[in-house]
Amino acid sequence: MKALLPWGMMLTALPSLAGAVFGPGVCYDVGKGSYSADARVKDTPDTVLCWAASSSNLIQYWQDTYLKPHAQPNTPNGMNAKVYGEPQGTRYLNVYEQFLKSSTGDSGGFQADALNWWFKNAPMKELGGKEAYYSIFDAQPAAAEARSYLMEEPTLVQFREMLEKAFRFKGQAAGLYVWQINRKERPGTMPSKSRFHAITCWGYETNASGEPSALYLSDSDDRTFGVFMVHVDRREIHDPFSGMSYPSIVFYTDDDVDGYQPGEYEPNLHSACAVLTPESVAKPRSKPNATPAEAAQKNTLLPAGAKLGSDLLVGNGENSVLLHAEKLKLDATLRISGGSLASVDALSARQVQNDGKLYLHGGANAPGNVQNKGYLECVGADSITLQGCDNSGRLALRGNKAANVKGGDFRNSGTLLLCGKAGISFDKAALDSTSGTILLGQDANGCTPTELRFTDAEGRTLSVTSAPNAVGELHNVRITPTSIEGNGSNAVLRHVKISGNPKLVNVQLEP
């Protein structure tokens, strides 16, 4: 392994082994032990902010992957300009500096809590209720999953499943929380004043049985600043403090295969958090906690759980608009008018219940997790994609080039109007989730699609082409590459030209 800088290592320089999984690029070790000189911690050679240090590693690694295209000047990111000793010339992550400034004292904590504070402004007593920098992100809630293994007597297979989840996507690593039986310390580390300790896992290896056999860790109490390998095993351990014995996942170094020798690194796993899925991709926004009246500004945030009972216009149709809303209940009319940038969402909305009218103009993607019982209109300047919507009302999807519907969480029991000048695509999962009416073709705005493509799991397609200046309607119809199946007299295709010579079953065609 080759050190890139005192604060980072290239994982690609590690040996390539069968069964090895590494996070790509640079990993971080903020070396928080050097903060022992901080005036607030005068009587100890160590602080207990290892949870903040490990969380900083994870956050910076994720920001390197997803934040760069959207970085703002006030984003805590990269290295701090300060230079510290121990070792000489050390510099630290700005993310960790923010944790240090916000901390109310030398208090222990958990990585999962720190990550949720950073990305969601969730309360964390160790940070005294101070506001996080979360307001610069428009992100899904950080997927910081804390799971305690200490009392579960986990198997190696269960531990492997956690690791697989932690390293499934780019930009992910794992924060591990360990229980230091017999106060095992790796040489070169700051002596810990707590039996609990937070470390960062950057990769793992499995044996022929698929069980974890090694981990690649960084310990931010480590004065040597490096990624080191530990072996993994499941052993019966004895806790001298409680007098209890129980099986646990144990990490050990090469010199400690046969026993517990003082001065060697051998904690056992207490809990783990696999964090920050790629759905958490960051987009900048201006300020948190805007009231509905303030939401007409560019890049705004509605408070979580907001209820909008009066009409509201957001945007002027020229600038790009990003409205962030969680658990929004809409009983009135909300119009969001953005610019022509198809790469900017007009609305990033999660868990929105629309019983009124919601207009989204200027986005490339319709919002996910919307329950629409009223009228929802999504217009894309280029193409537009809809997924994750439960529509029992009337939903209009218009793309200046194409309109695409993806299945999965999509359900339609109401009316869906699709308009895409260059075509409309519907995957099979979306079609199978449709029991209502699909309208295609021109509407009051003169939007006329050239074709409607239905794609099955194998990628085969059947095109349904609308006649010129006509509106096609599909009522309770299921289309496959070889047949069109309907529900008796309720299955009607109107003003539609069908290509592909499919077999018609219980379907009525009207001119």
Spans of model-derived segments:
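Predominantly the structural core of cysteine protease catalytic domains
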Residues: 100-206, 212, 265-270, 284-286
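Active-site signature of cysteine proteases
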Residues: 160-162, 177-294
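Positively charged n-region of N-terminal signal peptides that target proteins for export
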Residues: 1-6
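Active-site-adjacent structural segments surrounding the nucleophilic cysteine of cysteine proteases
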Residues: 18-127, 254-256, 260, 280-286
